[in-house]
Every structure is written in C-alpha cells, then in structure tokens.
C-alpha cells in the first residue's frame, strides 16, 4: 500500500505547510459526493489519529484515514498548471469512471 507525490506536489505542500507554520502533513481522503459517488478530500492535518496510515514521500507526511485507504492505494498526487488554472491532481489507478465535470469518481 502506498501513496506518492510528484516533485511539484511535494514542493507545493511544503510551501503551504511552511507558510501555515504548523501541521503534521497533508491529509487525503474520500467522501460520498457528486454524481459518480465519491470525491477527494485534501486538507492539512494537525494531528495523526491512531487509525490513520502515514506515508512519507519527498519529505512530506501523507496521512490517510483507514476507510479511505482502499480507494487511494497506489495514488500519485500531482500539482499541475494548465493555462491560468493550477491545482492538485489525483492520478488514481483504482478509478473506474469519473463524472463529466470531473468532481467525483467510482471505483
């Protein structure tokens, strides 16, 4: 089981954490949402819970709750710039289908 970050994503997360001045790392998860069933959750983690799984890649701690791990295993988190837009992109090998707007997915 693993989660990885591209260099661009790791640099962006390290920058956000440094500007924030606190935090254990980046928490990734999934929640029920959208027309395809699930959506990604990405937030800073100030604490690591007992049921969390922690990965470290490129100097960044990535924290996943136990229920989300099955949906995120093998995912690579990237940070991309496309024209005037920029943001995190999940490259998830478990995704079977995405909705038309790209906001939710099924496995």
From Swiss-Prot:
GO MF annotations, alphabetized: 2 iron, 2 sulfur cluster binding; iron ion binding
Essential cofactor(s): Fe cation
Annotated positions binding Fe cation: 35, 99, 101
Listed GO CC annotations: cytosol
Cofactor mode of binding and number, as noted: Binds 2 iron ions per dimer. The dimer may bind additional iron ions.
Disulfides per UniProt: none
GO biological process: iron-sulfur cluster assembly
UniProt entry tagged with the keyword Metal-binding: yes
UniProt KW Transmembrane helix keyword: no
Pfam families: Fe-S_biosyn
Keywords, in A-Z order: Iron, Metal-binding
InterPro entries named in the record: Fe-S_cluster_asmbl/transfer, FeS_biogenesis, FeS_cluster_insertion, FeS_cluster_insertion_CS, HesB-like_dom_sf, IscA_proteobacteria
Subunit structure as annotated in this protein's UniProt entry: Homodimer; may form tetramers and higher multimers.
Similarity remark: Belongs to the HesB/IscA family.
Function: Is able to transfer iron-sulfur clusters to apo-ferredoxin. Multiple cycles of [2Fe2S] cluster formation and transfer are observed, suggesting that IscA acts catalytically. Recruits intracellular free iron so as to provide iron for the assembly of transient iron-sulfur cluster in IscU in the presence of IscS, L-cysteine and the thioredoxin reductase system TrxA/TrxB.
Protein name per the record: Iron-binding protein IscA
Species this chain originates from: Proteus mirabilis (strain HI4320)
Gene from which this protein is expressed: iscA
